[in-house]
């Protein structure tokens, strides 16, 4: 049986250590109460006194059904998890003397990656003495970024790292949303 972290996060009823608490809830006047009166009010309503913000002075407590409260918190956390999108980085490799057809083919793929909402990391790989053509590689990557200007924005300009010259492009947010709605 796994332990529920969410239940350990909140103190309820007699676990609350403060002498005074600010009470909020649907059926309660919002103000500061002594802990004994707040517990009595929760008992009369057959609900729990839940410490929501223990760091506040005085701590904020809510009169609510504890099981329902935990359920709502879990539901809220799941919704937040769904909203977080995983960032996927697609890589495209060029050589320093990439032909026009190869370039257009890779450009087409990069456009589709950016439309899907993925980042694109394009790099020119220099082998042996081809490192002498690093200016050509930089020109190629800048042209690549310029051709993808409508689909994404440059996140990192071309940098030489070892035998690779790398550029990173991120999708434009507004463009992604409008393209997804069209489908």
Swiss-Prot record:
It is found in: Cytoplasm. InterPro entries: T_IF-3_C_sf, T_IF-3_N_sf, Translation_initiation_fac_3, Translation_initiation_fac_3_C, Translation_initiation_fac_3_N. It holds the Pfam family IF3_N. Disulfide bonds: none annotated. Keywords: Cytoplasm, Initiation factor, Protein biosynthesis. NCBIfam families: infC. Monomer. IF-3 binds to the 30S ribosomal subunit and shifts the equilibrium between 70S ribosomes and their 50S and 30S subunits in favor of the free subunits, thus enhancing the availability of 30S subunits on which protein synthesis initiation begins. Belongs to the IF-3 family. This is Translation initiation factor IF-3. It comes from Azobacteroides pseudotrichonymphae genomovar. CFP2. The lineage of its organism: Bacteria, Pseudomonadati, Bacteroidota, Bacteroidia, Bacteroidales.
């Amino acid at each position: 049986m796994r332990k529920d972290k969410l239940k350990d996060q909140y103190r309820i009823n007699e676990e609350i250590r403060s002498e005074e608490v600010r009470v909020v809830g649907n059926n309660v006047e919002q103000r500061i109460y002594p802990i004994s009166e707040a517990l009595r009010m929760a008992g009369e309503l057959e609900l729990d006194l839940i410490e929501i913000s223990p760091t506040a002075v005085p701590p904020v407590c809510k009169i609510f059904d504890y099981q329902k409260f935990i359920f709502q918190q879990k539901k809220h956390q799941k919704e937040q998890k769904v909203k977080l999108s995983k960032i996927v980085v697609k890589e495209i490799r060029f050589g320093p003397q990439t032909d026009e057809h190869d370039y257009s083919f890779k450009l087409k793929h990069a456009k589709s990656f950016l439309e899907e909402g993925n980042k694109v990391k394009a790099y020119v790989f220099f082998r042996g003495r081809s490192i002498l053509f690093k200016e050509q590689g930089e020109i190629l990557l800048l042209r690549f970024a310029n051709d993808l200007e409508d689909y994404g924005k440059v996140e990192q300009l071309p940098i030489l790292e070892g035998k690779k010259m790398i550029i990173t492009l991120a999708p434009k947010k507004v463009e992604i949303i409008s393209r997804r709605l069209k489908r």
